[in-house]
């Protein structure tokens, strides 16, 4: 199945999108669903990250690659259509979905109640907790040490909210993406990066000196990554759920995991360490 990538949404803020993008049909016409639209179009438009190594990042050939990307491409293949990748950020992914610019979100988005008020979600396809990453020689060894310290992350990330609950005296600072937050820590502009553990592991693995950074502290919370879809479209959500569950049953999820996250990947994690098992229905 041919994969197409468009990069026209790079660096666009949520506010700017609302102004600059042409009007889009956020809801399918009466009597149709997103599944009907995707089938008719012949293309599945997936919102993916390009700043999360291992899940969605740009390789040396300029292609967006990663775990989430492979999941989205495999979903398209199982639906019998092509895939088109739209770069999104934590701040832009939900607005783009609501505006009808993309058909789904496959972009390290955690399913939790506040988000469920505005979009719907598939079954989970990955699980991760949230922690802090600091320089190895940092005096910060635990959440208690973050009092008065600066933690960087990306706008719209759940981790910053959880940090504020766990350590109210920590000072949060947001950046355009996780690489920018990581760079800020390297330059001493923030004292730590707070994010999903899998994201922190990817940033560390892709740095020139991975051993210079450590992931510390108790988990700030965690949850399933799931596919985000527009509300009230059960036919579309079911199609995605069944495809994800079939991937789990036939071994394709394992193949994608091993390629991007497993012991032979840059992240070098095992399924036991992740502790994830997909909800599969008979």
Residues covered by each model-derived region:
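N-terminal twin-arginine translocation
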Residues: 1-5, 14-26
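Ligand-binding clefts/hinges and TM-proximal coupling segments of bilobed small-molecule sensing domains
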Residues: 27-28, 158-175, 212-213, 244-282
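Extended ligand-binding regions for polar small-molecule ligands
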Residues: 28-29, 70-78, 150, 157, ...
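Extracytoplasmic small-molecule ligand-binding "clamshell" domains
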Residues: 28-108
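Short helix-initiation/N-cap motifs at beta->coil->alpha
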Residues: 31, 85-95, 138, 157, ...
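A ligand-binding cleft/hinge motif common to bilobed small-molecule-binding domains
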Residues: 92-95, 108-117, 162-165, 191-221
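Periplasmic-binding protein-like
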Residues: 126-134, 197, 201-241, 263-282
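Flexible hinge/capping segments at coil-to-helix
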Residues: 134-151
